[in-house]
Each structure stands twice: as structure tokens, then as C-alpha cells.
């Protein structure tokens, strides 16, 4: 499969998110747009796989989302590939990141359950923190 994006996890990277409020909101908005084309979510060893119906421009969107995630969440590996009919996103990490990775895997469901354009970033942040993710920048408006 041709690869759009691939980056391995950084060894011993801390379980942190460096995104600020605007970055996190933009990322969530990007996911919301991408998930309109999501056809399947699969658990894989140490991570998850999101499978999308290929659409014009979707590969570029997913590549940009994965690159921003890889810059922020260095404890995870990201691979986005294309087989022509489908675009596949895989994310994995080591056991210490498992609860966080599981939480991220549920993002399509969480955003589907929260269909408002002004989705509740604070609720998403609380879920990620409960899974063990530490935010190093303010993601909630004061």
C-alpha cells in the first residue's frame, strides 16, 4: 500500500499533549470532517486502525492530522496508507500508553455522540486526562 505518512514513536517519550486550545479545536474539527468517511474501526495489537472510504482530498487531510498528532503525541506511532479504495490510519504505542490510545480510538464515537460544531473540548480533555494524558498547554479558554 502506498504510504501517505509514517512516523514511529519516540523511545521513552512522555505521555503528554502539547497542543493549545486553538490547535486542539482545529484538530478536532479536522477529525470531524474525516470521520464523515470512516467505515470501520478495528483494535490491533497495541493500538487501533481507522479505515476510511477514499475520497478526493481525504488522504491529504488525514496526513496533516497524523503529522500534527505525531508532533504532539510523540509516544505513539502513526501510519496512514492508501490502497486505492480505502485509506487506513494505524496508531500504536507501548503498554504505558494503552489507556490513552484506547481513548483516542474512541474519538469517532465520541464526536458522533456530540454532533454540535461547538463540541465540548473540556469533556474530551477530561476523558484523555482520566486515561493518563498530561496536557502541557491550556486547551480550555479561561
What is the meaning of each model-derived region?
Residues 65-69:
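Short, solvent-exposed amphipathic alpha-helical segments in soluble enzyme
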Residues 1-64, 77-142:
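Secretory/periplasmic and organellar redox-cofactor proteins
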Amino acid at each position: 500500500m502506498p504510504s501517505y505518512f509514517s512516523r514511529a514513536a519516540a523511545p521513552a517519550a512522555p505521555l503528554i499533549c502539547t497542543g493549545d486550545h486553538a490547535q486542539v479545536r482545529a484538530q478536532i474539527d479536522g477529525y470531524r470532517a474525516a470521520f464523515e468517511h470512516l467505515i470501520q474501526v478495528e483494535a490491533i495489537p497495541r493500538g487501533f486502525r481507522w479505515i476510511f472510504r477514499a475520497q478526493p482530498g481525504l488522504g491529504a487531510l488525514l496526513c496533516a492530522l497524523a503529522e500534527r498528532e505525531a508532533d504532539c503525541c510523540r509516544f505513539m506511532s502513526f501510519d496512514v496508507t492508501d490502497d486505492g479504495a480505502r485509506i487506513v490510519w494505524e496508531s500504536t504505542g507501548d503498554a504505558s500508553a494503552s489507556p490513552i490510545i484506547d481513548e483516542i480510538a474512541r474519538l469517532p464515537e465520541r464526536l458522533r455522540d456530540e454532533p454540535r460544531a461547538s463540541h465540548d473540548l473540556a469533556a474530551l480533555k477530561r476523558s484523555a486526562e482520566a486515561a493518563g494524558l498530561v496536557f502541557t498547554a491550556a486547551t480550555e479558554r479561561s
